[in-house]
């Protein structure tokens, strides 16, 4: 059911007959007037004709069934909706799943998101990725697509090797019971990395010129300060690692040996230790994300790609390409594309893509080469029509390199259907984050802080603490999703839990208000008893908004813009709360007016229930 579409179709038919212009062309150019007194649906005439005679036409039919008046204002033809007929269209058979229309030709879509390095807890940067990825998957499912969510486990790189070295130097201890496991892993990684960097900087000082010396001393001071803070918190781990690392003459060689032994599966102990550490960290990730109701269908290990020889096959294929070249002493794939290919791959014409280095001088492959193999795997394993990678905007060029490489290696269809869903950074005021230095605000810390603020506000209002985690989830989700993905998010914990405006809890509160009005009603809703003359002011605005919901929701899903859906729901909540503060519903003595208002409440309740569910926010019956 799409009521506003029915309105537009009728209006387009009327105008098509009067102007002798194709009905579909008229329909596609409809707009909504900026001011409600102008009308409800508008056609800018110059978008459909350049004919001066038609541009100056002034007489139109009086209307139809859903359009009760047609009026011209300058170059615009405006239609005014017949409120009573629209009301009947919506509520005569009002479905419980009112909202997103199911797509006629569903696709199989893979959404890969979060994919954080398994070396420390998830932090605020991962938070935006995880929520966006989860909501994209939910939106696509709501539209009728078959969706598979995947997490790419980066277990074969230098960072995991540093973590592994630290863990081995500590004597392979068991995790403490009183600390979250990924937090403990992050401590080992950060301390090991800081100590390695300090030792390296000290060695470099003797061969540095004056300017380099000043810069390195400054960096060394910062590292030593951080090391001191870590030692205060974790003296046993720090002292043990400091002692063991000081005994190693060539620590880089140790790290490289771990990397090579793991990539080649040539040392069973290294393989077992890394898998153990990585899986421990993933358990911590899952525990954190479970609070936000985020789950994955599959976890894909980078090492499995290497061990299965998929990456070797890609290198072999690339080496036979006519685009292969030498680049700075390495083997690389030249990414020269014609303008048509760039357009198809969404790569700007003026951007020069650097060659894709396939193999390092030491024979190991880069992550971009592995990404080619992984992209093919994602399409293959799920028989996917489309793969969406949720990755920060800083990775835009590597993602373009990936698409270009696939295209030039003969996988043109896959390259064109590999989508980079880019997003901006999350800013926490006064905080510079660095996972390798152990300087970050973890997702768990954010959840706990939001939980504390929400708990205090619920207690102030005498609310239900049983819903606390659902309110925490909604506050965090809304704060992330209400901002367009390509813009940065400034995360202020105190502002995101506001029961009175512009927040997830505010929408939940509005839903609870609408639900409880209906729950207290003892009358059966009967459209034959409605007083249509009372569809005025905010009630009319709500009716028009209810009519528009399927169009707005479907467009938001198809364009992957959850912020549009949330913005629409917030607008409805604002109108509804303003109206409810001035007009009673259940206490209205006039049966016709009371029945009308109950139907309006029912419409708002359904929109909020279905809209919130789509974005992973639980509609609450009590707050």
Curated annotation (Swiss-Prot):
CDD domains (UniProt xref): ArgRS_core (cd00671)
Superkingdom assignment: Archaea
Keywords, comma-separated and alphabetical: Aminoacyl-tRNA synthetase, ATP-binding, Cytoplasm, Ligase, Nucleotide-binding, Protein biosynthesis
Any single GO CC term annotated in Swiss-Prot or TrEMBL for this entry: cytoplasm
GO molecular function ontology, one term from the record: arginine-tRNA ligase activity
Localization annotation: Cytoplasm
Reactions the enzyme catalyzes: tRNA(Arg) + L-arginine + ATP = L-arginyl-tRNA(Arg) + AMP + diphosphate
Gene3D superfamilies tied to this protein: Arginyl tRNA synthetase N-terminal domain (3.30.1360.70), HUPs (3.40.50.620), Isoleucyl-tRNA Synthetase, Domain 1 (1.10.730.10)
Record has Hydrolase as a keyword: no
Keyword flag ATP-binding: yes
UniProt motif 'HIGH' region: location: 116-126
A Pfam family annotated for this UniProt entry: DALR_1
Annotated family: Belongs to the class-I aminoacyl-tRNA synthetase family.
Name assigned to this protein: Arginine--tRNA ligase
Chain's gene name: argS
